[in-house]
């Protein structure tokens, strides 16, 4: 039987992907162990830097990450590195609000081309960032390169919302990091909780250039989706969930190859989780680094 082709890592032309979600933490060193307990393979610690306008080393951005990479999308965990920078201050401000998910990144083929559209939509995006991150490879270290276009925090209170263009996807999605004990294949969705669902969805639509769509509470993308719920509706998607602040990114969803195997792994490792009636597994709180992580069988709805 012919193998089903894997989805392309990055979008083409006018496509928009849900690229990755980011959890903010105050301290990165313990993260790899926490991800490993959940069954994720993690990338090594990597500091972020902004490419200089002239020759020289990248300027530290004040943050670093550890990631779990999937065949579609990834989960990023970010923490401070000690420098006093605008990005580090934003991370600290978000952590004071609540721990957990604070970043949604959408990937596009050409971030700079979206600047004029975002200006016209009233977002006044900050200057384009030429982000650099050193990554290990089997042949030594290399520099992963990204263009990142962020909108000002005041315009998107849900978190750090950005458009990213990958210039070196093969360095980011290295095959040795794509297999996970918990069977995760793809990042499939983000769940946003807001008082005014329609207004929040409309803003995300303007950021991504996807204003239309038949589903009023869902922003459908070429890969992945963002769903929106009110506080009163949150328990339908996340039973036992609490609301730390509004609006907020409530959960990340992951498709797994065999949900029963994921369930066995979590039980064997003593990871507290909710086994829902519709077959999803939800890990929240400290075990999920302050976030809510939803595992669902590949091909099923992440939020039910």
Where are these regions (language model features)?
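A short beta-strand-loop structural module common to alpha/beta enzyme folds
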Residues: 43-50
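Membrane-anchoring hydrophobic segments
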Residues: 50-51, 60
């Amino acid at each position: 039987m012919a193998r089903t082709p894997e989805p392309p890592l990055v979008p083409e032309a006018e496509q928009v992907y849900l690229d990755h979600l980011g959890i903010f933490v105050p301290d990165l060193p313990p993260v790899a162990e926490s991800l490993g307990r959940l069954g994720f393979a993690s990338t090594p610690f990597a500091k972020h830097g902004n490419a200089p306008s002239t020759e020289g080393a990248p300027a530290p951005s004040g943050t670093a990450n550890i990631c779990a990479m999937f065949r579609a999308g990834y989960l990023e965990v970010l923490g401070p590195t000690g420098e006093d920078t605008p990005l580090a201050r934003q991370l600290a401000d978000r952590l004071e609000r609540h721990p957990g998910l604070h970043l949604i990144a959408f990937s596009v083929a050409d971030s700079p081309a979206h600047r004029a559209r975002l200006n016209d939509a009233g977002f006044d995006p900050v200057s384009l960032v030429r982000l650099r991150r050193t990554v290990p490879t089997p042949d030594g270290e290399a520099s992963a390169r990204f263009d990142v276009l962020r909108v000002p925090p005041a315009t998107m209170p849900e978190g750090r919302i950005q458009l990213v263009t990958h210039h070196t996807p093969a360095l980011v999605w290295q095959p040795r990091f794509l297999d996970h004990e918990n069977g995760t294949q793809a990042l499939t969705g983000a769940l946003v909780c807001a008082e005014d669902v329609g207004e929040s969805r409309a803003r995300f639509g303007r950021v991504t250039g996807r204003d239309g769509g038949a589903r009023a509470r869902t922003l459908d993308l070429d890969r992945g989706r963002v769903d929106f719920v009110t506080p009163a509706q949150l328990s339908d998607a996340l039973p036992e969930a609490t609301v730390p602040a509004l609006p907020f990114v409530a959960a990340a969803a992951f498709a797994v190859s065999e949900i029963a195997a994921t369930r066995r792994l979590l039980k064997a490792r003593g990871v507290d989780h909710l086994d829902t009636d519709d077959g999803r597994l939800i890990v929240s709180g400290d075990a999920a680094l302050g976030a809510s992580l939803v595992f669902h069988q590949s091909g099923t709805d992440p939020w039910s």
